[in-house]
């Protein structure tokens, strides 16, 4: 029953993790655990019955709470991915919210600290441009503008909730990154956008100013021997409709700066002499 303290995981944390990492926080994971093995395990089912646990989610939370108590007794605190919420949150745990923002917000509402790292904005191993033009990567496309647009602590949550949101984190998983140069290519410059997300209030963000600065930063990063992604020259369009004036306003932008965008309004192909 007390195997955690005498051997097994307790031994791993005591002899390896705690010795190697002097930090206050220890990340214990807790994500993507398939519970079908626990369903089929007689020992797991026996423990669930003994402890009055109604399902395997509660079994995971039971184990995480025991790990937390062990580490708290050693003067440490745990961080876990948002799945640790599923069967009930350990008393002092910090939640790292990756499956969207809901897990982090739920933890903050419960008075627990949260770190926001939603896959939709913070996963730097995902494509950053058209996959047809990029090295093999994981997941969907997350361009730098999407990362920059993220607001980890919106005013709508209220200050009583936002005070529990510690910040943001960028994640880079290396399955598709065989070299350091490839990792640099995926990390830079999106990590700079994420840094601004962490320290700049939403009302102080200026996308056009950031676009100018980030292009300068890319040039600087290259002078230091790194291998950053070159921002896309692809033109993005957005439109707004003024119903009162019966007009449609079309905006043409690009990640690249400076760049000349030429256009026509008669359906013909733009040329170097077309309007800017």
Which positions does each model-derived feature cover?
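Hydrophobic/aromatic-rich, well-ordered segments within soluble, folded domains that form packed cores
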Residues: 25, 30-33, 188, 258-268
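Single conserved hydrophobic/aromatic residue that forms the stacking wall/gate
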Residues: 2-9, 13
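Conserved alpha/beta catalytic core and glycan-binding cleft of carbohydrate-active enzymes
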Residues: 75, 80-91, 98-219
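Short, compositionally stereotyped local motifs that mark structural "simplifiers"
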Residues: 201, 205-276
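Gly/Pro-rich turn-and-neighbor structural signature
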Residues: 19-26, 30, 34-108
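Substrate-binding and catalytic surfaces of secreted/luminal carbohydrate-active proteins
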Residues: 16
